[in-house]
């Protein structure tokens, strides 16, 4: 920088609203958002989730209504997560392979009613297992990698056949991206994208999500043998490199705000779209601060989402998607 004060006044371009907009380095729009939605059985059902104030589980007909709302707000994609009734949960999570399971019903309904909306689907077994883990467990309670990966391939094909646009494996099994990509190609699902949860950390911020899908009370122990250690950053780059080499189109970092440094490093190291998941605990924490009078919801929502974009994200999965889109649309 050659100039100095007073010739250089950095406040000069901040002095008016139009100038601040003109010089903004980062732009946030509704097109940057993905809206996570929880699906439950029934008709005309809305079930508020106590640990996620303002978020509900919706029956399939109501999911379609949310899809129309997303379209009208300019949100390009919704993400689906099923609440599986306890009687449908098994040790092996076989309900994940049912072509008429809740996830597949919701996919078909959305693609029939709102075909212009992208549908992202979660690939993992935790919504379907009686033990709450993302994969199959052995007699010692260890989540086994390779047999789980085979099950995930079948789950991904089931969702793709129903019409899913983006398959998003969140399980963190080694090698599953390559297996899923090979299977999708073999079944002529050439345009089905894979968004890999490449850097998914074993985090304390997932609690409300587990309430939402009904797995919190089922889980024994933790997921530290397959999700990443929150002390590690270099390992995240290895995970991303592995998933890209196996055929992932985009990658995700999860959670979001506590891992902005990982987002920056991934974006700098790889010229691919990077997404973040502003997870349930982050959402609940923000809502709790608003309820305590510690800040303005609108300002906090937009500032946190802008932080993801500034760090290098192409988009953000956030439970605030509809609210943020309304703010951004004026």
Residue map of PLM features:
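Alpha/beta enzyme core
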Residues: 2-5, 16, 28-34, 40-330
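Exposed beta-strand/loop interface patches that mediate assembly or binding
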Residues: 6-12
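A broad, low-specificity signal marking well-ordered, structured residues that form hydrophobic/aromatic
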Residues: 22, 35
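Acidic, Ser/Thr/Pro-rich intrinsically disordered transcriptional activation regions
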Residues: 11, 18-19
